[in-house]
Structure formats: C-alpha cells, structure tokens
From Swiss-Prot:
One of its GO terms (cellular component) is host cell cytoplasm. It is found in: Virion; Host cytoplasm. This is Minor capsid protein VP2. Keywords: Capsid decoration protein, Capsid protein, Host cytoplasm, Virion.
Length: 133
C-alpha cells in the first residue's frame, strides 16, 4: 500500500468518524428540540383549556347577570303599572290607615263630628285651665 493510499484511507476514516459524531450530535439535538416542542405544545394546550374555561365561566356569569337584570326590569315594570293603576287608591288607603280623614267629596276644610267635638273640648279645657297648656 502506498503512502498516498494510506493517507486517503485515513482521511476517509476520519471523515466517517466525524460524520458519525455529527449524526449522533444531530440526533441528540433533534431529540432535545422535539422534547422542548412537546413541552411548549403541552403548555399551550393547558393555557387554551384555561382560557376556554374562563370564557365559559364568564359567559355563565354574564348570562346570570342578564337574567337578573331582566327579572328586576320586569318587576319594576309591573310595579310601575300597579302604581299607575292602583296608586291613588293605595295612597288614600294608607292615609286612612294612618288616621287621616279621607272624604273624596271634601275640599279638605270640612271637619267630622269627632274632630269638632275634640276641638271644643280642647278649647274648653284651655279656657278653664290655662295652666295646663
């Protein structure tokens, strides 16, 4: 074997070894890259699941809030209708329950018999016993 052939054989063996080491390093690098991509994909999937859960919960909250506001608006509408239709009668009944006189045909200046009697008794007491008042 000539020297040139030996050098050529040695060079090709060195290249084969370098290629082998390079391919092993590339395989390790590729495996690490795939592992990191898998972890990143897993984290992205978890984030999307959390985001979807948040959006579903927010939708449910908005739905409950909307139903609540609708119910309140409906109650207010019925209360306004009831006060518009029955308000004067309810006011008159409340005044009568509180002890006020309520005569629909009165202009407010007429006194009932009991009121006149009470005024006369009060005037009489003040006239005869001024120190009491």
């Amino acid at each position: 074997m000539s020297v040139a052939a030996a050098i050529t054989a040695g060079a090709s063996a060195a290249q084969a070894g370098t290629g082998l080491i390079g391919s092993i390093a590339n395989a390790i690098h590729e495996g690490t890259r795939l592992k990191l991509q898998g972890q990143a994909l897993g984290a992205q999937i978890k984030f999307q699941e959390a985001e979807n859960k948040f959006n579903r919960d927010r939708f449910e909250f908005d739905k409950l809030n909307t139903e609540r506001w609708f119910r309140l608006a409906k109650e207010q509408q019925s209360l306004v209708y009831e006060l518009n239709t029955k308000g004067p009668a309810m006011r008159a009944q409340a005044m009568m329950d509180a002890g006020f006189r309520n005569n629909l045909y009165s202009n407010g200046n007429q006194l009932t018999f009991n009121e006149v009697r009470e005024a006369q008794l009060s005037a009489e007491k003040r006239f005869y016993n001024p120190s009491l008042f």
